[in-house]
Amino acid sequence: MSETINTAAQFPSFEKPTVQFNEKGWGPCELPDTFKDVPYQPFSKNDRLGKICDWTNTSNNDKKYQNKYASSFGTGNQYSYYHEEDETTFHLVDTARVQKPPHQRGRFRNMRNSRSGRGRNARGGLNTHGMTTLSGKNVKARDPRHGRGMGKKFGHRGPPPKMRESSVAVRADWASIEEMDFPRLIKLSLPNIKEGVDIVTCGTLEYYDKTYDRINVKNEKPLQKIDRIVHTVTTTDDPVIRRLSKTVGNVFATDAILATIMCSTRSNYSWDIVIEKVGDKVFMDKRDHTEFDLLTVNESSVEPPTDDDSSCNSPRNLAIEATFINHNFSQQVLKTGDQEPKYKFEESNPFISEDEDIQVASVGYRYKKWELGSDIVLVARCEHDGVLQTPSGEPQFMTIKALNEWDSKLANGVEWRQKLDTQRGAVLANELRNNACKLAKWTVQAVLAGSDQLKLGYVSRINPRDHSRHVILGTQQFKPHEFATQINLSMDNAWGILRCIIDLVMKQKDGKYLIMKDPNKPIIRLYDIPDNTFDSDDSDDGEGDDEGFQQVYNYAHNKI
């Protein structure tokens, strides 16, 4: 039986495909639906499509070159490879040190030292008979990998330094005469300057109350607000200096102005002093309505107060607070009252008239002269704040000042209430670091006035956030010359700086000059300024010269 063979079932049939003809270019005219959502990126066969697994190298280097496996042919990055760290397997690990039993502590210490050849007595090791090792805190300070060294070495600059403002704006018509840098001034010396000779003494002093020597942290006393007038009179407005300038001396100033110049190498903030040369006489003045008489706070600190005027801890608000505290403390520690004895100098207070009925602070004025050589005779007004009655009956004159604590955490200092009674030396050392210029000025003023004692009070805020209420935590007294030695204050260098500036001015022609501390550099500049500079305020007042000494401060009513 014959079978019929179906050739169509054995062999596949061929269907002619439909080819689209693209008249405008090459390629299909329409995109099939199956390839419509597939992304496309131009590529080259030479591009690396991935990275082989490498377990030997660390992944830190790949962070810097994350795109080195990206396609270099096209601009897209759909198929680029990125090496990312998988944080899903991240776990916290307890790194707390396991406390070893006492018998296992230091078990292999000697063995390790002996192997390395740097044991206690080995060369380069620790010598038990020599210098003691530094503590961990000091080692960090010395190690360049810690603190500031790391920033300078590895490029971490930190915050930019603060740019302080100048005490006075330098005008275009001022001519710069001389620049004196601090390294040069520190090397100056004028030895063998004798004690000043009294010319005139004025004012009335009250006696010191010794009960304040028994105040401590546990027996603190509130600081009172004393309603008394303090005169802050500049040199040329002083009627006594005007009278003495006709017969005695050729250089005239006040103790505050002299202390600012003599301690200039310790200052960081800007200040200025006006100098007038008339013939062979030189008058050193402060400008009116300035902050010259305000006491700085933490001027020499590593972290000075922030420049935020709205805060009570800004430099200006702290200066007003410190001046307020200093005035009230110097008057509170005295025996006040009509029945209490007083020490009167030869002349009365030159800044008040007999018909005035005002409460004046206890201040004694000494007008003294010094021979500085080369026919230079200095005449200055110095001040005492109080007097102390000794068992022998001889009075001892005192310079009374106050240090204030505002916020130990912000000031990077020690807490007085914890350390003042037990470690007073540490508290004073911290104040010497933070207020080196202010303490040096007080010491120079006490030495110039010839005070027998420098009394320092420690005044703190009741609450660090309340700058209006304070308490007295203790007192401490020093002899001015001994205290100058303790704080490394050389009076020979101080006299040398003053003499250097006097010699520079003496070489100039008659006129008005200004010396100013640069706000951001350890430099003092001497300017030649026009004669009418700073005279606009005085001419507007229309007051005579006799009324110039009426500038006063009443700190009890100042708002701080």
From Swiss-Prot:
Sequence positions bearing Phosphothreonine: 128
Region of interest: Disordered: 98-166
Molecular function via GO: mRNA cap binding; translation initiation factor activity
Cellular compartments annotated: Cytoplasm
Presence of keyword Acyltransferase: no
Keywords on record: Cytoplasm, Initiation factor, Phosphoprotein, Protein biosynthesis, RNA-binding
Region ranges (RNA gate): 291-305
Pfam families cross-referenced by the UniProt entry: eIF-3_zeta
GO biological process: cap-dependent translational initiation; formation of cytoplasmic translation initiation complex; regulation of translational initiation
Basic residues bias: start-end ranges: 100-121, 147-156
Keyword Phosphoprotein: yes
GO-annotated cellular components: eukaryotic 43S preinitiation complex; eukaryotic 48S preinitiation complex; eukaryotic translation initiation factor 3 complex; nucleus
Subunit structure: Component of the eukaryotic translation initiation factor 3 (eIF-3) complex. The eIF-3 complex interacts with pix.
Domain notes: The RNA gate region regulates mRNA cap recognition to prevent promiscuous mRNA-binding before assembly of eif3d into the full eukaryotic translation initiation factor 3 (eIF-3) complex.
PANTHER family tied to this protein: EUKARYOTIC TRANSLATION INITIATION FACTOR 3 SUBUNIT 7 (PTHR12399), EUKARYOTIC TRANSLATION INITIATION FACTOR 3 SUBUNIT D (PTHR12399:SF0)
HAMAP family per record: eIF3d
Purpose: mRNA cap-binding component of the eukaryotic translation initiation factor 3 (eIF-3) complex, which is involved in protein synthesis of a specialized repertoire of mRNAs and, together with other initiation factors, stimulates binding of mRNA and methionyl-tRNAi to the 40S ribosome. The eIF-3 complex specifically targets and initiates translation of a subset of mRNAs involved in cell proliferation. In the eIF-3 complex, eif3d specifically recognizes and binds the 7-methylguanosine cap of a subset of mRNAs.
Family label: Belongs to the eIF-3 subunit D family.
Protein name as it appears in the record: Eukaryotic translation initiation factor 3 subunit D-1
Organismal lineage: Eukaryota, Metazoa, Ecdysozoa, Arthropoda, Hexapoda
